[in-house]
Amino acid sequence: MALLEVRGLARAYYGVRAIAGLDLDVAAGTITGLIGPNGAGKTTAFNVISGLVPPDAGTVHFAGQDITGRRPEEITRAGLVRTFQIARGFPRLSVLENLMLYGARQPGEGLLNALLGQGRTREEELFERAVATARRLNLLRVGNNPASDLSGGQKKLLEIGRALMTDPKMIMLDEPIAGVNPTLSGQIGDHLLSLRDEGITFLIIEHHMDAIARLCDPVIVMAEGRKLTEGRFADIAADHVVQEAYMGKRAHVP
């Protein structure tokens, strides 16, 4: 059953179509890959689905809800969260502080919380969750370090950790291993497989085909703002239409 359903999604910038009639489904409990040549519309699709930019046409349904055009924070509360290729955290805050900041339903410093004594309890709960998340992602040893001190791979892990702190049903990852050394890339892949086995669904944009082959089934290929084809990685890689799209030849997208 599809957890995410996208139908007829379209978005243009200054008259240039970035996505044009995009249809895609992401089944619950999968790691689905989203690949395609540069300019295929992958990041625009992420931006529209996650509410960063409104669609010109089309619909997005998640977990049975119509989330088309909703604000990003509303979509996150519904259980769908995305990460970015370039980390968007708070570089001067520590790793644990970054994680706590993204915790679901974090209370403010309101008078009611102070009177009832609940603010501190919630802060302690968030801290415990942040520690558990950092430990899981092998970030606890740098938990008190500023996020700006992390390596590129550690920043990718922190992006995943922040997403986990929102209690997501599904995470959209934008190039989670770009610029990461092979050892840490493998570790990130291990984390994603483990999280999938625990019930979290993923949609991943990635240009490293080894990672796509290892992690993703199915794989969706985009070209010219639409879905070109979908299937197992081995079949996708052998498809001459996909090969032509990557080599810059004009692919026929029905």
Q: Model-predicted segments: where are they?
A:
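Glycine-rich phosphate-binding loops of nucleotide-dependent enzymes
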Residues: 2-254
